[in-house]
Amino acid sequence: MKPLNILISNDDGVFAAGIRALAKSAQKRGHKVKVVCPDQERSATGHGLTLQSPLRVEKADELFGDGIEAWGCSGTPADCVKLALSELLDNKPDLILSGINHGPNLGTDIFCSGTVAAAMEGTLENVPSMAISVASFKWKNFEYAGEIAINIAEQAINDNWPASLLLNLNIPPCAKSKIKELSWTRLSVRKYKNQFSKREDPRGDDYYWLAGEVVLDLKSKGYGPKNWPSDVSQIQNNKISLTPVEPDLFWRGNLDDLPKINNSFVNPS
């Protein structure tokens, strides 16, 4: 295939090993790579934007090596993609990749994910976009995950990637030889037992640290074809999970189940 112009971002920041591995994988396949990502970790920022302070960017080419132009940005992942598309890139990219995230982005976690938000920003701008994650916070080998991501992206681009489709890719944290087949998956329902650690600062004021414990739920598969596995169960079985996502959050349940709301409070007589 002809070389693609690829924009890469993430939420783990410009110094993360995952984004460097992804950029190198794309470059090795002959693609033209540019990186615009946060200048420090911005995990779990969701689709937040910076409105109360200016965005600053600094060149970071030296972190990625020859042939890759890179910037570190003071904003969120969504800021980075917006700024790249509006100001930093000379031309609209053919593809946006976000990752490789150091940890999973499964199920309803995607609503908090800066990784997914960066890809979603691309989708909103009608650029084919994919979020990539290795489903472990401790896994350090991202090279094979980068190869998988580029392979999938190339296939999707060659098969008329729909403009409204965001691909959410999760790769199991195991050796290449132990990874099993790829499957389309449904978003699971990820639930947490939220825990706050209450502490006291030197001035005697209370502050809190959030620490959530995942409640494992392999049965809840969310919306989608009933014969598709959930993304969580796919990863549990050392299989690659690929979930189609779109910006449309319209409720897909039975319309008869909607609450009955009348208009009596509007301009009451």
Swiss-Prot record:
GO cellular component terms given for this protein: cytoplasm
Coiled-coil blocks: none
Catalysis: reaction(s): a ribonucleoside 5'-phosphate + H2O = a ribonucleoside + phosphate
The protein's Enzyme Commission number: 3.1.3.5
GO molecular function: 3'-nucleotidase activity; 5'-nucleotidase activity; exopolyphosphatase activity; metal ion binding; nucleotide binding
Source organism superkingdom: Bacteria
InterPro entries: SurE (IPR030048), SurE-like_Pase/nucleotidase (IPR002828), SurE-like_sf (IPR036523)
Keywords: Cytoplasm, Hydrolase, Metal-binding, Nucleotide-binding
Cofactor note: Binds 1 divalent metal cation per subunit.
Catalytic class of the enzyme: hydrolase
Locations listed in the record: Cytoplasm
Known cofactor(s): a divalent metal cation
One Pfam family recorded for the sequence: SurE
Primary role: Nucleotidase that shows phosphatase activity on nucleoside 5'-monophosphates.
PANTHER family xrefs: 5'-NUCLEOTIDASE SURE, 5'_3'-NUCLEOTIDASE SURE
Similarity remark: Belongs to the SurE nucleotidase family.
Protein name according to UniProt: 5'-nucleotidase SurE
Organism of derivation: Prochlorococcus marinus (strain MIT 9301)
Biological classification of the source: Bacteria, Bacillati, Cyanobacteriota, Cyanophyceae, Synechococcales
